[in-house]
From Swiss-Prot:
Protein name in UniProt: Tyrosine--tRNA ligase
High-level lineage: Archaea, Methanobacteriati, Methanobacteriota, Stenosarchaea group, Halobacteria
Cross-referenced PANTHER family: TYROSINE--TRNA LIGASE, CYTOPLASMIC (PTHR46264:SF4), TYROSINE-TRNA LIGASE (PTHR46264)
EC number, UniProt record: 6.1.1.1
Main location: cytoplasm
Amino acid sequence: MDTAERLDLVTRHTTEVVTEDELRTLFEESDPSAYIGYAPTGEMHIGHFTTMRKLADFLRAGVDVTVLIADLHAHLDDNKSPFDLLDARSAYYETAIEGMIEAAGADPEDVTFVRGTDFQLDEEYTLEMYRMAAETTISRTQRAASEVVRESESPNLGGLIYPLMQTLDVKALDADIAYGGVDQRGIYMLSREILPDHGGESPICLFAPLLSGLSGGKMSASDEASKVNLTDSPDEVDEKINQAYCPAGEVEENGVLEYLQHLVFPVLDVRGDSFVVERPEEYGGDLTYESYDEVESDFVSGELHPADLKPSAASAISDVIDPVRERLADKDELLAEAYPEKYGAE
């Protein structure tokens, strides 16, 4: 695979690359490494899957991939995960992410998993964090983390430490590429700015899109109707997609279309499959699509009606998450330990 092919593979389905010239040079000169970090807080859902799916592209392009389970970050961000649940939630995240990587057509054994507590308490890391804290203003760290950590009129100190640690993680994990959702952009721009003054190099940054919720607007972790969970049954997926905001001809904030664009079609492409919308012959018969653009074009023109799109979209989404669902099917004890209030640990 030549540089152009690797570059295309790694950058497709992203919202921004900072910068593409740096990434091209990196591929020409070395076999790069990339990392993504996830703080183990609430249950993972399909929004996470669109980001994790990209790791399969990194692997195919010959990139070494590390997944950081940022357990300390989960506690620092307004105690989203109590300290005594960090280990259980970290184990759950590892299992769920392995399933998502497998569902995307890659081998989770090819990915290195690391927890924050494996290295973030080391003396060298801690001393460098103190140096960074002494040289970075409160307003700069707040601006960097504004799209990630929970904000309030009286924020906890943990939310200020959070972006500094995330910056140091790039150096500690020896990552050439920092990958994450576009909400992470502020933190990684801080990393590019200050990391060279702390013994590291400015990371190349790739950002994934954030999906709209199924009810329109932003996807909310607290709104079950706004997202498909990785453990949802096929019937639950059908119900959520059937009730989703999907007005005829409208693309803006249409979660059903975004699921197809950023998750279903990339996975179908790897599998060599098409997306089929089943329709009665009296309404024109089945429609077969090889690309998302074809779906959007027919949807906007009115050729494809939401009533026909939704059942087929639900079936395709359910099929994509099935390997993850199966991996978690016999993990009742793990879920109960990670989320005792919901699953009732005995």
